[in-house]
Amino acid sequence: MLAIGLLYDDTLLAMAAIWRRSETFAHAWLVPPIVLWLVWRLRGELALLAPRPAPWVLLPMAVAAFGWLLGDLAGINAVAQLAVTALLVLAVPAVLGLAVARRLMFPLGFLFFMVPIGEFTTGVMMEWTADFTVWALVATGVPVYREGLQFIIPSGAWSVVEACSGVRYLIASFMVGTLFAYLNYSSPVRRWVFVGISILVPIVANWVRAYMIVMLGHLSGNKLAVGVDHLVYGWVFFGIVIGIMFVIGARWQEPAAAPRAPAAADAVGTATPAARVWPAAALAAITVALAPAAAWALQHPMDRPPLVLTLPTLPGAPDAAAQVLKLPPHFEGAATQAHRVYAGEGGAVTVHVAYYRHQGYGTKVTSSMNFLIPSDDRHWNRLAAGVARVPVPALGSQPLAMRAHELIGGRTASTVGREHLEVRQVYWAGGRLEHRSTWATAWGLLGRLAGRGDDAAMLTFYTDGQNPEAARRVEAFVGQQLPALVAHLEQVRAAAR
């Protein structure tokens, strides 16, 4: 484990950095001491077990190390951190044997709560929270006008932002509920039922919390629950709900199972000589060392000319008179960004390109920190989002799947006189066009492993107006001009080789 800590220190430190800066994962600081305490509780049983290395576990360790390599090259924190945690877990049976690992199954599994993962559910939980809040308001006689995650009631405007999603409550409840179930129940059925309850309760509680916050503000004339205090009310409510859940769960507490005597083959009297334990530890260390060595070789920077990106003149699409970037998409860590406004049939179409090179954890095109507009944007609101199938004859007979967004400007209870934008987006990664971030990451990783570099980009197209005219305009532009833009990006990539 010491070797894993030294070889993968960057990944472990990055994990701790997330615990420090993100309140969502602050609970992870408690995981290592809890695991040590759980192991200490079992010290009497562990003392009866003989260490018997299991060399075959080196194979899953190699798979986990390769998973870390892929996650590190792709800049995916969750994959790299899950892989390192798996290495820590697998090191126990590899060096100390399966009997020890079986007895430590829960403490070792609990280590995975160190990994700061789960924020991918934020979007869908925000939608669920908004759906329930609006439904509950209407059910209690409060009229609501809704636009995406924003809604307006007679007393004011409200929005569901990331902090309202309930992900923080869910992850904390899941961790504490899992520990509670292990310590208080011996039946697997009761344990799994309580873990399921610890997932369901915070989701529903967060919906009720959001509704109560809005109603507090509404009934108090926006004097209560409209500032920082509504977060305080939320945590108090959550604490009460979780406390009640544990009190009820304790009513079905079961006595702890009696310690099991080890099998004769696992008993201390049959201990494996230290001369066999140390070679197993050395082989495990060598296995886990291969992935960091490969990562260093693949990521060693090469001298390349500076990146210059200007969007080209396109045939049949002259420049528009006004070159104003009306909607600047948010892309962190891009090597360069460029935009150009083209005059099209019926109106102008703006093209924005965020170009990435030498991608890493904080500088990747598919980062969750990259978005079209933030959820609390004051200038634009998302009316709809989905996938559009856009015919691009030069790229094949199958329509190209693109991300589709309909945006509206301002925040009032009327759509009259408000600006609309019709937006289409697509990734260019590994020489392919892809609308799904996971596949874009995969194509980029394959290109990197094949020695073609990791250049990638997000192409954003938008035009003024409402469906269906604006949608036809922007999609017609994409169908005609996307091949030329892709060819230009290929030239930019080739110029740096």
Language-model segments: residues:
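Hydrophobic N-terminal alpha-helices or hydrophobic patches in metabolic proteins across all domains
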Residues: 1-497
